[in-house]
Amino acid sequence: MEIILIKPVRKLGKIGDILKVADGFGRNYLLPQKLAIRATEPNKELIVKQKHEFEAKDKQIREEVEKINALIKDQQLVFIRQTSNDGKLFGSVTNKEIANKLSENISYNISHSNVILDKQIKSTGIYTVEIRLHAELNAIVTVIVARSESEAQDYLREQKTETSEDLAESA
């Protein structure tokens, strides 16, 4: 299936790109999410005329996302959870919980689909989580999972000493 991107898509292309994609990917993801349109002759002519408008709109969205990224950057989210004796959580910390806590902290609604977890968080510790609000921009948030507030503070102190040691080694 041949499509024209009307929004930038990570690892695929930018606005106005004409691409061949698998039929299922186009029909089931790109078209319903309004990320692309079919590459028919009338649509190709239309996209040439409207490409500037799409790019201006994307630039405006990107500027807004950059402001939000500045708020998100270097956030530390602390989750207090019950655990077994070996530090395993009863359950897990989900992307929805991270999005909700982050939304509370910055007073801006973050969708759980913007929170990218490499793997589920099922034990205590410090994790880095990617927040992707735009195809080309992302921010990193530190998530601390602990049994108590004092344990969370210990993790923070431990992290600060590690970063100061790293800075001393690089100097």
Swiss-Prot record:
Pfam families: Ribosomal_L9_C, Ribosomal_L9_N. The keyword Transcription does not apply. Keywords: Ribonucleoprotein, Ribosomal protein, RNA-binding, rRNA-binding. GO terms for cellular component: ribonucleoprotein complex; ribosome. The keyword Ribonucleoprotein applies. One of its GO terms (biological process) is translation. One of its GO terms (molecular function) is rRNA binding. SUPFAM superfamilies: L9 N-domain-like, Ribosomal protein L9 C-domain. HAMAP family: Ribosomal_bL9. Belongs to the bacterial ribosomal protein bL9 family. Binds to the 23S rRNA. This is Large ribosomal subunit protein bL9. It comes from Rickettsia rickettsii (strain Sheila Smith).
